[in-house]
Amino acid sequence: MIPGEYIIKNEFITLNDGRRTLNIKVSNTGDRPVQVGSHYHFFEVNRYLEFDRKSAFGMRLDIPSGTAVRFEPGEEKTVQLVEIGGSREIYGLNDLTCGPLDREDLSNVFKKAKELGFKGVE
């Protein structure tokens, strides 16, 4: 074996099996391209991406690890999201969530996003 080499079985690998998914339409209302990585909490992506943020809470892009989706200015596209797994805690990013995704009261998270000008928060 070579250091860093992958030895993969010759069979299909199923990712995110059994996790909830969602197709969501996203528009880049900004004047610059925005690239979103595979494991970024989609609710907290760039404030100029407009979509239903409440529906996207606790989800990430359903794409292979290490890849990303790019949204050009004025572009609208539909992406598939998948539930975040693991401990389901989010810290950092745009500093909106900062804690467990499954807490009962999320009103302060949505309020903060709206106050900071994130599009798609009612």
From Swiss-Prot:
CDD domains: Urease_beta (cd00407). It catalyses: urea + 2 H2O + H(+) = hydrogencarbonate + 2 NH4(+). The keyword Cytoplasm applies. One of its GO terms (molecular function) is urease activity. It is found in: Cytoplasm. Pathway: Nitrogen metabolism; urea degradation; CO(2) and NH(3) from urea (urease route): step 1/1. The keyword Hydrolase applies. Its EC number is 3.5.1.5. InterPro entries: Urease_beta-like, Urease_betasu_sf, Urease_subunit. It comes from the Bacteria. Heterotrimer of UreA (gamma), UreB (beta) and UreC (alpha) subunits. Three heterotrimers associate to form the active enzyme. HAMAP family: Urease_beta (MF_01954). This is Urease subunit beta. It comes from Acetivibrio thermocellus (strain ATCC 27405 / DSM 1237 / JCM 9322 / NBRC 103400 / NCIMB 10682 / NRRL B-4536 / VPI 7372) (Clostridium thermocellum). The lineage of its organism: Bacteria, Bacillati, Bacillota, Clostridia, Eubacteriales. The gene is ureB.
